[in-house]
Structures are given as C-alpha cells and as structure tokens.
Amino acid sequence: MTRTVEKTNPRLTNLILLLKNTSRENEAKIWREIAGRLETPNRNYAEVNLSKINRYAQKGETIIVPGKVLGSGVLDQSVRIAALNFSESATSKIRDAKGQCMTIEQLLKDNPKGSGVRILR
C-alpha cells in the first residue's frame, strides 16, 4: 500500500490549481509541466544557481524555475526570472544586473499563454 501525502502549504496548492486551470484555458502546456513539477516532493524541486542561469539564458529572456534560485555565481545580463523562492543573495545579484525577480503567480498573470518562457532546472 502506498502513502499519499497532499501538500500542506496553501500557497503551493493554490498555485498548482491555478497553473492547471490556466493551462487548460489557454492551451499552454508549459503551465501543466510546471504544475507537475511542483506536485513532486520538495526534495525533488529544482535548485538553480545564478551561474547556470547566466550560462543558458540570453539577455532579455524570461526564465522560470520550479523551485529555488540560489546566489552562487555571477549574472552579467538582465533577465526576468520567475521562481517559487529566491535566496537573498540571488535577489540582490539579479537586481544589480538590472534583472527582474518575480513569483510564478506574477508571471502567470503577465503571460497566461506562456510564450517566450524557458524552464531551467
């Protein structure tokens, strides 16, 4: 018999439902993919350093991280980054590089179609 444990964080459960509904309404598969990754256990969430974002993102691009952005490394370009959480050092380094930190909810409101968004994990 397998154990099923539901998420206890109300922000996270509401976000998952919102992502699934938006995916269905706008036929945007990217939001369903993000919702699926957030339904996994917390230990499987992405932890992405700024050095990886700097390596794979281009200037002016929008990146989504289904997990936490960490502040290790340097960011030399301005990118929009949406994530579940940010470390304090990551937030300050992104702002110093003229980038933008946002929650997944904010990105969902700004871009419900999900066009031009890349997932990093």
Curated annotation (Swiss-Prot):
Keyword annotations from UniProtKB, A to Z: Ribonucleoprotein, Ribosomal protein
Q: Does the keyword Ribonucleoprotein apply?
A: yes
Cellular component per GO, a single term: cytosolic large ribosomal subunit
Q: Name one GO molecular function term.
A: structural constituent of ribosome
Task: Look up keyword Coiled coil and say if it applies.
Answer: no
Report the sequence similarity comment from the record.
Answer: Belongs to the eukaryotic ribosomal protein eL18 family.
**Name assigned to this protein:** Large ribosomal subunit protein eL18
Q: Which organism is it from?
A: Methanoregula boonei (strain DSM 21154 / JCM 14090 / 6A8)
Name the gene that codes for it: rpl18e
